[in-house]
Amino acid sequence: MPITISGSTGVAGVDGSAGTPALQGTSTTTGIYYTTNVVAGSVSGTQKFRLDSTGIYAPANAAAAIIGLTDAATIAVDMSLGNNFSVTLGGNRTLGNPTNLTAGQSGIIFLTQDGTGSRTLAYSSYWKFPNGVTPVLTTTASAVDAIIYTVRTTTSITCNYALNIG
């Protein structure tokens, strides 16, 4: 397909599709393509992302990595690293106020008891739970609990929890 340069207005005639993207790397089925008011990307002929006038759309099978946190007296969470986190508690801890918060960010923090168990977790001021009641973690050795969160503002994280999930 030829590319037409339209003066200072941009490039035209490069629409493509998921199976034959307009802009390709070494694979002819991987790249970026365009449709009306849409920019999308494909890998091996399958659409992996789509950006249109409503925002970014991710297919149902999209997944985010679970980022390991460092166990410490105050557990630090850098929200710029991802959305989902995991830590094994090696003692009674505090979940610190995260850095790099973005309103609307959401995810899960998995909390695992170490082999001893009976570890407790306190929460710094940004973490907000229903009715102001923080969860009491499952104390069984190796138990897993989860904090489900959405960042409301840069100083307020709305949370809920799931206890003893595995």
Feature annotation, model-predicted:
Residues 1-15, 163-166:
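Short, intrinsically disordered N-terminal pre-domain segments
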Residues 2-10, 27-59, 156:
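Beta-strand-rich receptor-binding modules of extracellular spikes/adhesins
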Residues 10-30, 90-94, 126-134:
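Extracellular/surface-exposed low-complexity repeats and stalk/linker segments enriched in Gly/Pro
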Residues 16-22, 37-38, 80-84:
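Short, hydrophobic/aromatic-rich segments at coil-to-beta transitions
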Residues 19, 28, 37, 47, ...:
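Residue-level marker for the onset of beta-strands and adjacent loop->beta junctions
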Residues 56-81:
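Extracellular beta-solenoid/beta-roll
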Residues 77, 85-88:
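A mid-sequence, solvent-exposed acidic-amphipathic segment
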Residues 87-166:
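Acidic, glycine/polar-enriched metal-coordinating patches/loops
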